[in-house]
């Protein structure tokens, strides 16, 4: 359980592919939903593996999400979307005349921010501008839950996850099982035509089990020739 506070915070769920990152994100969202908390989910425009407006896990669970650009200042659309939700859900109460209030017949706005939890999946597909967005959201009092892999297929740091892990209050790094030897897997093995990818291949290629495997350090392979 996370500590109950009066301020926002950032949670990061990371690890290799097939380690259950999105599944853990969805589990936390389900718990928040059961508790009556309101939730807003966002995903990068580049990820459409489970539908354009759906966050999905490899085991089939899904959650509706808003799609936002993954580059530059457009990432701040996350905050703009929350502002619209806040405005749309802000309610007013018409006070009845003679009800004992000091403002008979007046209008009292309620301070309903409408969203308690902000979730962002596949954070590794966003630019580093996402770090500033998440910090701003936490400073505004939101619980921010972010998931994404922290390593490229080369085994190198995959921004912005390392920076998010540095500023987050809570970090959980999950492991998968190596498809080759059964040891704990921490690496993303990219396969091209069933062969290990070349070290000079592009960093971002969106795929599922047909293009990636989870592997341990010893079984992870990069082609150099």
From Swiss-Prot:
Domain of life: Archaea
Active site: 122
Positions annotated to bind Zn(2+): 178, 181, 216, 219
Signal peptide residues on this chain, from the entry's feature table: none
Entry's Gene Ontology molecular function annotations: ATP binding; thymidine kinase activity; zinc ion binding
Keyword list, A-Z: ATP-binding, Cytoplasm, DNA synthesis, Kinase, Metal-binding, Nucleotide-binding, Transferase, Zinc
Entry GO CC: cytoplasm
Biased composition (Polar residues): 90-104
Pfam families: TK
Reactions accelerated catalytically: thymidine + ATP = dTMP + ADP + H(+)
Quaternary structure (record): Homotetramer.
Protein name (Swiss-Prot/TrEMBL): Thymidine kinase
């Amino acid at each position: 359980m996370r500590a109950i506070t009066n301020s926002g915070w950032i949670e990061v769920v990371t690890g290799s592919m097939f380690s259950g990152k999105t599944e853990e994100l969805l589990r936390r969202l389900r718990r928040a939903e059961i508790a009556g908390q309101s939730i807003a989910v966002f995903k990068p425009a580049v990820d459409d593996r489970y539908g354009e407006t759906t966050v999905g896990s490899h085991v089939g669970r899904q959650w509706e999400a808003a799609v936002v650009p993954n580059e530059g200042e457009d990432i701040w659309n996350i905050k703009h979307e929350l502002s619209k939700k806040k405005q749309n859900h802000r309610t007013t109460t018409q006070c009845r005349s003679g009800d004992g209030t000091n403002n008979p017949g007046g209008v009292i706005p309620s301070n309903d921010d409408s969203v308690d939890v902000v979730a962002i999946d596949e954070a590794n597909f966003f630019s580093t501008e996402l770090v500033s967005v998440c910090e701003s959201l936490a400073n505004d009092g939101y619980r921010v839950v972010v998931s994404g892999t922290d390593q490229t297929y080369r085994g190198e740091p995959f921004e912005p996850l390392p920076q998010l892990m540095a500023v987050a209050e809570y970090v959980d790094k999950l492991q998968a099982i190596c498809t080759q030897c059964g040891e704990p897997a921490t690496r993303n093995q990219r396969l091209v035509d069933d062969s290990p990818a070349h070290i000079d291949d592009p960093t971002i290629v969106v795929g599922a089990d047909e293009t990636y495997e989870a592997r341990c350090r010893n079984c992870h392979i990069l082609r150099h020739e």
